[in-house]
From Swiss-Prot:
Gene3D superfamilies: Galactose-binding domain-like, Laminin, Tie2 ligand-binding domain superfamily. The gene is LAMB4. Transmembrane segments: none annotated. Laminin is a complex glycoprotein, consisting of three different polypeptide chains (alpha, beta, gamma), which are bound to each other by disulfide bonds into a cross-shaped molecule comprising one long and three short arms with globules at each end. The alpha-helical domains I and II are thought to interact with other laminin chains to form a coiled coil structure. Domains VI and IV are globular. This is Laminin subunit beta-4. Residues 1376-1408 are annotated as: Domain alpha. Residues 1175-1375 are annotated as: Domain II. Residues 1243-1301, 1416-1480, 1525-1759 form a coiled coil.
Length: 1761
């Protein structure tokens, strides 16, 4: 055997050497093999029987009897012993096993379309395909290929029994050429029924191929993926065979014995062998015969398929090898100066095909295609060859002065007279190295094409000789000239050549220009905005420079200050203290004030001037413009706010504290000596108080007229602004005093110049005129001051207001008021309307006539018309249009046909019934006037009634006073109460009290806000959704919105639809009041439709897409969202989350898992997927040995494959090969069949199967426990309840709308009804709160129990997962360290084949602890775990149902209470609105009754109408009900008591902490007893203190713990009260405050508890310290015994000892008491926890409360008004 193996290796080496020789002689190719070998995981089938569960299938046999059926179970890989019924796709790979026909691949029953796909890792050359079927061959199929890893597919060939039917568009028959796609019927017949083959040859040998390397042929024979699509099964017709129809599909399926895909590694003729691809296992891990995909390239080629040349082998183009032409790649020729090159086809063609390699990165200063010439700046050494590394010498030329930057002559040429290394100078350069400028030139430069430049000095700016610096070229310039050529002026000068010194100064304005720099050409300075002129001293058109007094603040617009000035005196009997006095200009006299006029200020009063328009931080002088009315001086006190300074301003004295100044009576302006500093963007206020220091009787009524307050900027506060000379001129000419005066001003030139400059500086330019377009003549204004040219009677700097005594500013100016001197109170009128202030009975714009109803201007009197006329002649007083049937100048008598005395107040009444007897409208027998009552009594005819027979009887209408209008029945379309005498007018027939929401003269129309048919009594309220209609369509106050009176359709906002405008249109969502809906904006490519969820805007995404707009890939999908999202093809059990890369789709395997789909265990791990435990440590050793052997065998297999076609050349070896084959077969038989029969493992296998079934059942039960599948039903129920609540909410909205339109009587009734409902609901909620809290605590306890049981179940599951039976021998080896396939005696423990004393097999019991015993124990544990989990499942489900029921009921109760609270609030608001309407109605009635000239019959009618109003309940009861509601709404205030109580408890805990610290301090004193004997006397005192402290400490601890418990209870109560308060009121701020207080109380309670624990800890420390005290006392006693103390001292010491021992005993007793208290507290906690057991009793109460609340809610929903 060893000899044969050596022979194999020797022959393999010979074959390899021969293959290398073949590559040297021409084209060479790798051997062809089966591409399926070693690619089990890359072979996939779309359908396999029994993958998810065992599946029955039948075969066509026993035609006369019952058909024969079998089971397919492919959940585990095929194993001849354990899994013989597994028919996965990897069974079709040829393995040369003896019993080959016992395994095959089989599809699911009855499927026509099934595909098999092979995914290769690289591009392979495909030869042919052979399929061997177990069943009938397919009736139709096709074979496809892909060369781009499955992105695009091409068909190889179609196969079908009936090509015309299966593939109608495909040509059938023989192919006419290579690669023709045809349909072949040769391999699709029904015979044979088994063992039939389908063969596909890529290149038909019947066709001659001229160029096998053409792109067409190469594309035909290469592939990366192969797909076989079965499209139709052969069916034989069950009716003919008498089969049952219900299982006819069980016998039709695809079954395949073998699949051979012959091919080789594709290497373009440049390799004879291949190796595994990168990132794949090498030969040591590959099965024998596997065809690898990475070429081992020859001929200087490279790449996976040898598709390119190696680096530096680029001299010729790459070509595939063909026959004897190897077309090897040639190396480049670079003269030893480069190791890199590339191929250039243009160079190759230009050389005639000799050389195409271009060298890269030439070294040694060389360049060129072959690095055969020197680089620029170098030249060739004639004494050295070009391949010499020092052949190129650098040039010695100045690069700045030579042509081409220092390049010299590269080589000598006698013909041209050039010498190698010679420099080539530029035109203006000279020298051997070209490093000098020629005369009268300068500046040798590399950028200058001439090398040097001529001097070129400007004659206007330079001295009269043309020379310059050789290096810089600088010419010699005049005084104010600069530049290299003296061609420009220096900064601050302009006009080259126009001045003796070369240039003129700029002279820019110091304020109008930014600097003193100007244009050197024209001298234009850089002006600030809106400033013009060469020197920037003129404003632009429409702009001006502000004067000194520009910042004026009118006293009339200032705020009056309340109170007296600090330095002023009181003023009595004068009010108000400040009064505005308008100044009226006198023609011909100058105006001495600004603004409308003055502010008349009394002594002690003040004015506040608001200053917020400061443009620049600067010091200002305050100027006050005033006029005194007496010879006495006044005093002002000034306060500036805010007073603080900043980086720009330093606080002045005036700004730091109030200052007083005198206002002389002889002047009209006062400039305060102390300046103030103001800056921009600050709101200042300047308070000015006025007073008279010497106020006597003669000045009691004195006052001062204040015009304005001005701020004058100080020029000296501007830094670096002007020179000292300018400041001197400014002060010399008194610029400030002149510019501050009122009236026309004539400024000196120096003042005007400096003021203009300062204005431009402060305002950063000129200020806009802003002349009023109607009040001014034009848009321009004065250069300094900005005064616009005003039209007549128009004043103001901008001409924007009328002068005093005029009005109506327009294009014509203003009009004078012309108020009548007798009719008006003043000569000044309103400046907008022109209305003069008239006296009481005077009217008219000018107050020049009497009011209506008055006469005799200017002494206007009321018209004397006896109240029967309103108007009279304004001059004579004669009455117009007398009423009441009166006549005369003063309406003092009755007209003809009436009687009465108007002068005495008796109205005129007709003595008619109703007309006079001579007319046709007389409906009485007679008429008379009662002398006592003065009543006119008519005796009416039949059919008429009334005092004057002027009315129809009840049930009739008409107007007897009009001819032809008899009384008729009221026609109101059945929409009135016919028994009501006031339901319609008996005179006109007009319907007055329409019912059923109707209106109109005949009740024929629906009311506004209603729709339907009034004739059919179907008028209904418009149900428009308030958010979906335009607010213009809904009346204010909550009334019904308008809708179509017939259909009820509401006017919807944009993109809103529905009859009630209650939903968004398709493709829109988010209904917003007043704006409508917004677009869904769903991605049309990835969403199912353009519609989206109307609440969330979520678009309905297609499968695989997510995001709100479906613009993202869904989790567990990958790809490009705009293009395509592909599901991750990964095994979830073997992946992490997310399971694949979102961009590439590559599966993310967890540790220990591998495979493209993460569906198998990685090498080095057990193959029990998905657990994949790491193998034993010995695995690595064996794996190395097996890999070495596998590699050797694989080499032999390749050798055998190469020698397969050369068997005829080695006849002498045929016998040896035959012997070797026999030996190999024998070895395979021995390896596959163990030394003992398989029947010995049957009993073990049965236990294995039983345990596995138990594990599967337990897994299913655990899934049920963990997943709570019935939660889905709970969620569905919750959704249904939410839908019902939504419907109820809509009903409540409709109810609210009806309530808002109800009458006061209905609202009162509803308030009473809803109050009872809300009171009942509030009571139920209060009762429910404790139940809900108890339920929540119980639910938490149950969840704790559930977690405990779950952890136990997880532990059982983990134990079960450890029970695995991969293989009997491997399992025994892992358990006992030995495979167990030998007798039991030498083993450390019993194996799988243990025997007893009598030789019988023993597989359990003592001494046999192998896999069988382990399986038996595992089965027993699994059964126990199964029972535990079943009980756990029942308990968990019962508890979960109870928790969900209670939770749902509590949630429903909470929601119902919230709804009731909201309804009650709405009704309360409605009642308030109705109350306001009633008050308004009562006010109107009172005003009506108080009016004069109201007829008595109208008053009587109104009184009767008011008396007819009846409330449903007495007013006192209604008031009581409203008071109760208000009391309930104020319940939140009661929580303040709880807050105070908790604060007191916290204070008590803090005091207790102080006492505990005092006790600690007292205990520390005891520690110093060892210092002196005298301190022992303090022990007794300390003992007393300690006793009292511990006693108090114990009591305080008990009290604190009680307080803690009480605080916790109050906290829980406050939480429930907070929830109740939140239901009663919508005041979110109040709730937030209460929650903050609650959190503070909780913190206090926690702190108190912590302090109590700290006090207990201190008591324990006190005990320890006392023990230490005893020790120190003992030490001290020993010391005293040695020193010999006196008897007295020893007695005192003994007393102290006894006292200390007593103190210790007392301390220990108190510690025990504290311990007992702690135990009691724990017992109380346990008792509180036990109360949770009352949940079962409370459940019934919660259900009853819920039902009652639901019933009340239903009753409330039916309470429509």
């Amino acid at each position: 055997m060893q000899f044969q193996l050596t022979l194999f290796l020797h022959l393999g080496w010979l074959s390899y050497s021969k293959a290398q020789d073949d590559c040297n002689r021409g084209a060479c190719h790798p051997t062809t093999g089966d591409l399926l070998v070693g690619r089990n995981t890359q072979l996939m089938a779309s359908s396999t029987c029994g993958l998810s569960r065992a599946q029955k299938y039948c075969i066509l046999s026993y035609l006369e009897g019952e058909q024969k059926c079998f089971i397919c179970d492919s959940r585990f890989p095929y194993d001849p012993y354990d899994q013989p019924n597994s028919h996965t796709i990897e069974n079709v790979i040829v393995s040369f096993e003896p019993d080959r026909e016992k395994k095959w691949w089989q599809s699911e029953n009855g499927l026509d379309h099934v595909s098999i796909r092979l995914d290769l890792e690289a591009l392979f050359r495909f030869s042919h395909l052979i399929l061997t079927f177990k069943t009938f061959r397919p009736a139709a199929m096709l074979v496809e290929r892909s060369t781009d890893y499955g992105h695009n597919w091409k068909v190889f060939k179609y196969f079908a029994k009936d090509c015309a039917t299966s593939f109608p568009n495909i040509t059938s028959g023989q192919a006419q050429g290579v690669g023709d796609i045809v349909c072949d019927s040769k391999y699709s017949d029904i015979e044979p029924s088994t063992g039939g083959e389908v063969v596909l040859k890529v290149l038909d040998p019947s066709f001659e191929i001229e160029n096998p390397y053409s792109p067409y042929i190469q594309d035909l024979v290469t592939l990366t993926n192969l797909r076989i699509n079965f499209t139709k099964l052969h069916t034989l017709g069950d009716a003919l065979l008498g089969r049952r129809q219900n299982d006819s599909l069980d016998k039709y399926y695809y079954a395949l014995y073998e699949m051979i895909v012959r091919g080789s590694c594709f290497c373009n003729g440049h390799a004879s062998e291949c190796r595994p691809m990168q990132k794949m296992r090498g030969d040591v891990f590959s099965p024998p015969g596997m065809v690898h995909g990475q070429c081992v390239c020859q001929h200087n080629t490279d790449g996976p398929n040898c598709e390119r040349c190696k680096d530096f082998f680029q001299d010729a183009p790459w070509r595939p090898a063909a026959d004897l032409q190897d077309n090897a790649c040639r190396s480049c020729s670079c003269n030893s100066h480069s190791s890199r090159c590339h191929f250039d086809m243009t160079t190759y063609l230009a050389s005639g095909g000799l050389s195409g390699g271009v060298c890269e990165d030439c070294q040694h200063n060389t360049e060129g295609q072959h690095c055969d010439r020197c680089r620029p700046l170098f030249y060739r050494d004639p004494l050295k060859t070009i391949s010499d590394p020092y052949a190129c010498i650098p040039c010695e030329c100045d690069p700045d002065g030579t042509i081409s930057g220092g390049i010299c002559v590269s080589h000598s040429d006698p013909a041209l007279g050039s010498v190698a290394g010679q420099c080539l100078c530029k035109e203006n350069v000279e020298g051997a190295k070209c490093d000098q400028c020629k005369p009268n030139h300068y500046g040798l430069s590399a950028t200058d094409p001439l090398g040097c430049q001529p001097c070129d000095c400007n004659p206007l700016g330079s001295l009269p000789f043309l020379t310059c610096d050789v290096d810089t070229g600088q010419c010699l310039c005049l005084s104010y000239v600069t530049g290299a050529h003296c061609e420009e002026c220096t900064v601050g000068y302009w006009g080259l050549g126009n001045h003796l010194h070369g240039c003129s100064p700029c002279d820019c304005d110091i304020g109008g220009a930014y600097s003193n720099v100007c244009s050197p050409k024209n001298g234009q300075c850089e002006c600030r905005p809106h400033v013009t002129g060469r020197s920037c001293s003129e404003p632009a058109p429409g702009y001006f420079f502000a004067p000194l007094n520009f910042y004026l603040y009118e006293a009339e617009e200032a705020t009056t200050l309340q109170g007296l000035a600090p330095l002023g005196s009181e003023t009595f009997g004068q009010s108000p203290a400040v009064h505005v006095v308008l100044g009226e200009p006198v023609p011909g006299n100058p105006v001495t004030w600004t603004g409308p006029g003055f502010a008349r200020v009394l002594p002690g009063a003040g004015l506040r001037f608001a200053v917020n328009n400061i443009p620049f931080p600067v010091d200002f002088t305050i100027a006050i413009h005033y006029e005194t009315q007496s010879a006495a001086d006044w005093t002002v006190q000034i306060v500036v706010n805010p007073p603080g300074g900043s980086e720009h301003c330093i606080p002045k004295t005036l700004q730091s504290k109030p200052q007083s100044f005198a206002l002389p009576a002889a002047t009209r302006i006062m400039l305060l000596p102390t300046p103030i500093c103001l800056e921009p963007d600050v709101q200042y206020s300047i308070d000015v108080y006025f007073s008279q220091p010497l106020q006597g009787e003669s000045h009691a009524h004195s006052h001062v007229l204040v015009d304005s307050l001005g701020l004058i900027p100080q020029i000296n506060s501007l830094e670096n602004f002007c020179s000292k000379q300018d400041l001197d001129e400014y002060q010399l000419h008194n610029c400030v005093e002149i510019a501050s005066a009122m009236g026309p001003q004539v400024l000196p030139g120096a003042c005007e110049r400096l003021i203009i400059s300062m204005s431009a500086k402060l305002h950063d330019g000129a200020v806009a005129c802003k002349c009023h377009p109607q009040g001014s003549v034009g848009s321009s204004c004065s250069r300094l001051g900005g005064q616009c040219q005003c039209k007549p009677l128009v004043v103001g700097r901008c001409c924007d207001r009328c002068s005093t005594g005029s009005y109506d500013l327009g294009h014509h100016g203003c009009h004078p008021c012309h108020c009548h001197p007798q009719g008006s109170k003043d000569t000044v009128c309103d400046q907008v309307t022109g209305q003069c202030p008239c006296h009481g009975e005077v009217s008219g714009r000018r107050c020049d006539r009497c009011l209506a109803g008055y006469f005799g201007f200017p002494s206007c009197h009321p018209c004397p018309c006896n109240r029967f006329a309103e108007l009279c002649d304004p001059e004579t007083g004669s009455c117009f249009n007398c009423g009441g049937f009166t006549t005369g100048r003063n309406c003092e008598r009755c007209i003809d046909g009436y009687y009465g005395n108007p002068s005495s107040g008796q109205p005129c009444r007709p003595c008619l019934c109703p007309d006079d007897p001579s007319s046709n409208q007389y409906f009485a027998h007679s008429c008379y006037q009662n002398l006592w009552s003065s009543d006119v009594i008519c005796n009416c005819l039949q059919g008429y009634t009334g005092t004057q027979c002027g009315e129809c009887s009840t049930g009739f209408y008409g107007n007897p006073r009009i001819s032809g209008a008899p009384c008729q029945p009221c026609a109101c379309n059945n929409n009135i109460d016919v028994t009501d005498p006031e339901s319609c007018s008996r005179v006109t027939g007009e319907c007055l009290r329409c019912l059923h929401n109707t209106q109109g003269a005949n009740c024929q129309l629906c009311k506004p806000g209603h729709y339907g048919s009034a004739l059919n009594q179907t008028c209904r309220r418009c149900s428009c959704h308030a958010s979906g209609v335009s607010p213009m369509e809904c009346p204010p106050g909550g009334g019904a919105c308008l809708c179509d009176p017939v259909t009820g359709a509401c006017p919807c906002l944009p993109n809103v639809t529905g009859l009630a405008c209650d939903r968004c249109a398709d493709g829109y969502w988010n209904l917003v009041p007043g704006r409508g809906c917004q677009s869904c904006d769903c991605d049309p490519r990835t969403s199912q439709s353009s519609h989206c969820d109307q609440l969330t805007g979520q678009c309905p995404c297609k499968l695989g897409y997510g995001g709100k707009r479906c613009s993202e890939c869904q989790e567990n999908y990958y790809g490009d969202p705009p293009g395509r999202c592909i599901p991750c093809d990964c095994n979830r059990a073997g992946t992490q989350k997310p399971i694949c890369d979102p961009d590439t789709g590559m599966c993310r395997c967890r540790e220990g898992v591998s495979g493209q789909r993460c569906d198998r265990c990685a090498r080095g791990h057990s193959q029990e997927f998905p657990t994949c435990l790491q193998c034993h440590l010995c695995f690595d050793q064996w794996d190395h040995t097996i890999s070495s052997l596998s590699k050797a065998v694989q080499g032999l297999m390749r050798l055998a494959a190469n020698m397969e076609d050369k068997r005829e050349t080695l006849p002498v070896c045929e016998a040896d090969f035959k012997d070797l084959r026999g030996n190999v077969s024998e070895i395979e038989r021995i390896l596959k069949h163990p030394v003992f029969p398989s029947g010995k493992f049957l009993k073990v296998k049965d236990y294995h199967d039983s345990v596995r079934r138990q594990i599967m059942q337990l897994n299913e039960q655990l899934k049920a426990v963990y997943e709570f599948q019935d939660l889905k039903d709970t969620i569905e129920r919750a959704k249904n309840e939410a839908d019902l609540l939504l419907e109820d909410l809509q009903e409540e909205i409709d109810l609210q709308s009806s309530v808002l339109n109800a009458s006061i009587a209905d609202s009162s009734e509803n308030i009473k009804k809803y109050y009872h409902i809300s009171s009942s609901a509030e009571k139920k909620i209060n009762e429910t709160s404790s139940t809900i809290n108890t339920s929540a605590n119980t639910r938490n306890d149950l969840l704790t129990i559930l977690d405990t049981l779950t952890s136990k179940g997880n532990l059982s599951l983990e134990r079960l997962k450890q029970i695995k039976i991969p293989d009997i021998q491997i399992l025994n080896e892992k358990v006992c360290g030995d495979p167990g396939n030998v007798p039991c005696v030498p083993l450390p423990c019993g194996g799988a084949l243990c025997t007893g004393r009598k030789g019988h097999r023993k597989c359990r019991g003592p001494g046999c602890h192998g896999s069988l015993t382990l399986s038996t124990n595992a089965l027993q544990k699994a059964q126990e775990a199964k029972s535990i989990i079943r009980n756990l499942d029942k308990q968990v489900r019962g508890l979960k149902n109870q928790i969900e029921s209670i939770s749902e009921q509590a949630e429903v109760s909470k929601n119902n209470a919230l709804q009731l609270r909201e309804k009650l609030g709405n009704i309360r608001n409605q009642s308030d609105s109705e109350e306001e309407n009633i008050n308004l109605f009562i006010k109107k009635v009172k005003n009506f009754l108080l009016e004069e000239n109201v007829p008595p019959e109208d008053i009587e009618k109104v009184a009767n109408g008011v008396l007819d109003i009846h409330l449903p309940i007495p007013s006192q009861n209604l008031t009581d009900e409203l008071v109760k509601i208000q009391k309930h709404m104020q319940l939140c205030e009661d929580y303040r008591t709880d807050e105070n109580r908790l604060n007191e408890e916290a204070d008590g805990a803090q005091k207790l902490l102080v006492k505990a610290k005092a006790a600690e301090k007292a205990a520390n004193i005891l520690l110093n007893l060892d210092k002196t004997l005298n301190q022992l006397q303090q022990a007794q005192i300390t003992q007393g203190r300690a006793n009292s402290t511990i006693t108090q400490l114990t009591a305080n601890i008990t009290k604190i713990k009680k307080n803690v418990l009480q605080a916790e209870n109050q906290t829980r109560e406050m939480k429930s009260e907070l929830e109740l308060a939140k239901q009663r009121s919508g005041l979110e701020d109040g709730l937030s405050l209460l929650q903050t207080k609650l959190q503070r109380h909780q913190d206090h309670a926690v702190n108190a508890k912590v302090q109590a624990e700290s006090a207990q800890h201190q008591a324990g420390s006190l005990e320890k310290e006392f023990v230490e005290l005893k020790k120190q006392y003992a030490i001290l006693q020993r010391k005293t015994s040695t020193t010999g103390l006196t008897k007295e001292t020893l007695g005192k010491v003994k007393q102290l000892k006894d006292a200390a021992e007593k103190l210790a005993g007392d301390t220990e007793a108190k510690i025990r008491r504290i311990t007992d208290l702690e135990r009691k507290i724990q017992d109380l906690n346990l008792s509180r926890q036990a109360k949770a057991d009352q949940l079962r009793i409370l459940e019934d109460q919660v259900v009853a409360i819920k039902n009652e609340i639901v019933e009340q809610e239903k009753k409330y929903a039916r309470c429509y008004s």
